[in-house]
Amino acid sequence: MDIERTKQFYRDLKRSNLCDCAYCRNYVNEVAKAYPAVTAYLQTLGVDIAKPFETMPLELDEAGRMPYIGPQYLVFGEEEGFAAATVRDVNDVEVRLAQSHPGDNIQEPHFVIEIEPIFLPWTVEETKAKQ
C-alpha cells in the first residue's frame, strides 16, 4: 500500500468530481458523522470516507435509514500490507477487498476496498428516497 499516494489522491479529489445524485450526496454528507471509528480507520489507509468511489444504496429501511451495501474506495499501491478488518462503530463494519467494482482508468498500481454495512439517516430534503 502507498498511504501517502492515497492521501494525495483524496486531497486532490474535489467534491465536484464525485457523483451528485441524491444517494451519493446523502452518503457524503452523513457518513463521517455517523461512523467516526470507520472514518478514523480509513484515514490510517489514507482514505477520505467522504469521497467514495461507489456507494451502492438500497431503499430506506423500516427505521427510515438508507442502507449502503459496500461503499467502495480506491487505495494506491499493491494489496500487500492490506488486511481485511472489522471496525466496531454504530454497528460492526467489515473492511475488505472489493471483488468487483466499476472501471476507473487509473494507470498506476491500486486496488479497491469496500465497507459494509452502512446505515445512514436520509437528509437530502429535496428528494424523497424510495421506501
Where are these regions (language model features)?
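Mitochondrial intermembrane space
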Residues: 47-50, 57, 124
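Generic structural motif
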Residues: 26, 78-82, 118
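Residues in well-ordered beta-strands of folded domains
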Residues: 22, 76, 114-116
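Glycine-rich, aromatic-bearing surface loops/beta-hairpins
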Residues: 98-131
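Hydrophobic, Leu/Ile/Phe/Ala-enriched alpha-helical segments that form helix-helix packing faces
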Residues: 41-49, 79
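Amphipathic protein-protein interaction modules
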Residues: 52-110
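N-terminal cysteine/histidine-rich coordination modules
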Residues: 1-44
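A structural signal for short, well-ordered beta-strand segments and their strand-loop junctions
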Residues: 20, 51-52
